[in-house]
Amino acid sequence: MVQHFDTLLVNIGQLLPMESKGPKRGKEMSELQLLEHAALGIRDGKVAFIGTMVEADTFTANQMIDCQGKLVTPGLVDPHTHLIFGGSREHEMALKQQGVPYLEILKNGGGILATVEATRAASEEELITKAICHLNRMLSYGVTTIEAKSGYGLDRETEWKQLRAAKAVGEQHPIDIVSTFLGAHAIPTSHRNDPDRFLDEMADMLGEIKEQNLAEFVDIFTETGVFTVEQSRTFLQKAKERGFGLKLHADEIDPLGGAELAGELGAISADHLVGASDQGIQKMAAAGTIACLLPGTTFYLGKDTYARARDMIDQGLAVTISTDFNPGSSPTENLQLIMSIAALRLKMTPEEIWHAVTVNGAHAIGRGDTAGQLAVGRAADVVVWDAKNYYYVPYHYGVNHVHSVWKKGEVVYERRRAFEGLSISR
C-alpha cells in the first residue's frame, strides 16, 4: 500500500526505536531493538511509519531525507539538571587543583553559596536568557527532553523566581522541560542552626507551587551534613500528600539510607547513589524506583569511587544516567560525554547506555508516554547521528556526533560542516 508522509527518512543504517511499555530493568537493558537498512516516516509531527527500506520502497513524501547509512535514535533525555542559576564558578577549579578544601572555599563565600548569591541577584529575565544558552548546547548534543531543578535560591522569593524562569524557558525553547522543586537543596546560612524551620518554610510553598503548576516533582538532598533521613521523610511525605512525584539526591557520599527511603516512599527516582547500600538497592528494585546515576559529577570532582551500576543492573534496577548539569560539580551540557564515562567507569554496555539516555531517562521524569522512544503515534523527536552504528557514539568520546535533531517532526538543529568541500593539496 502506498503511503505519503510529510518527511521520510530513508537509507538509515541502524534505527533504534527503543519502544517499551515501561522502563527497562536489569537484564532487559541489554535487549536492544535494532532495525537495519531502515526508514522512518513522519506525518503531522508524529512518527507514522517505522520499518525497512524494502517496506518503504513505494512510499512518497513532501521531503525525502537520505540518511546515507547513518544511525537514527530517539531524542535523548537528560533527567537531572540544575538548569536555572546565576553566575559561574570557574575560579574554583584552580583552587581545588591546589588542594584547597571545599569547606574553605565555602567559608570564603564560594561553593554553592556563591551560586545562591548570584541567583538571588539575577533578574528573572537574566536567568531565562542564560538558561536558553545552556539549552541550545544541550539540543546540539541530541537532547530533546530534560528535567530542571530549582534549589539555588534557598529562600521563598528566589525559588519562585527559578520555577517561573524554568516554565518560561520551556514555553520558548524546543526542548521539553519537566520542573522539580528542590528548595531543600542545602541549609542556608540564615537557618544553619535550625534546618527544621527552613524545611517548614519550603514545605509552606508546596500548595501554591501545585496550584500554579510550577513543578511536577519535589526533591531533597539527603546526605551527611545536609538533611537527615527523618527530615527528608517528613518533608517528602508532605509533598506526596500534595500530589507531587518524589525524587531524592541520595547517598552521594555516605550510605545514609537515602536509597532505602526512596524505595519506602515509592520515589520515581533516587539520584547519585555513589554510597548506596545493598539493602538500599534492593528496596529501590522492589519499589520500582529508577536509579539516576551521575558519573560526570564523580569524574569532575576527581573522585575514584563511582556508583555501582553493575550491581544495580544485576539486581534488577532500571538505571538512567544524566549530566547533573550545574555550575559547581558538573558544568557540562554534553550527555554524549556522560555516555562515554558510563562505559568507561560504570562499566555499562552500549545497549544499557542507550536505554539509560532514552526510555529509562523518560520514565525517571514521568515522560515515558511522550519521550525517549520512536513508535507510531508518538512525537517525532529524532536524532540523526554522524555514526554508522550505536557503538560508535560512546566509543569516540569528547566529540559531538549529532548530524541533526528533529523535534515534533521539524529540524531544530543541524550541525554546520565547516570542512565540507575543503580540498587539501599536497
Curated annotation (Swiss-Prot):
| Location(s), subcellular | Cytoplasm
- The positions annotated for binding Zn(2+) are 80, 82, 249, 324
CDD domains registered for this protein in UniProt: Imidazolone-5PH
List residues binding 4-imidazolone-5-propanoate: 89, 152, 185, 252, 329
Q: Can you supply one Gene Ontology CC term for this chain's record?
A: cytoplasm
Q: Name one GO molecular function term.
A: imidazolonepropionase activity
- State the superkingdom: Bacteria
Q: Which SUPFAM superfamilies match?
A: Composite domain of metallo-dependent hydrolases (SSF51338), Metallo-dependent hydrolases (SSF51556)
From the UniProt record, list the reaction(s) this protein catalyses.
Answer: 4-imidazolone-5-propanoate + H2O = N-formimidoyl-L-glutamate
**What are the disulphide bonds in this sequence?**
none
Its main localization is: cytoplasm
Give the record's pathway. Amino-acid degradation; L-histidine degradation into L-glutamate; N-formimidoyl-L-glutamate from L-histidine: step 3/3
Q: How is the cofactor bound?
A: Binds 1 zinc or iron ion per subunit.
Q: What enzyme class is recorded for this protein?
A: hydrolase
Alphabetically list the UniProt keywords. Cytoplasm, Histidine metabolism, Hydrolase, Iron, Metal-binding, Zinc
Query: What residues bind N-formimidoyl-L-glutamate, as annotated?
Result: 152, 326, 328
User: Belongs to which family?
Assistant: Belongs to the metallo-dependent hydrolases superfamily. HutI family.
Protein's name in the database: Imidazolonepropionase
Instruction: Identify the gene encoding this protein.
Output: hutI
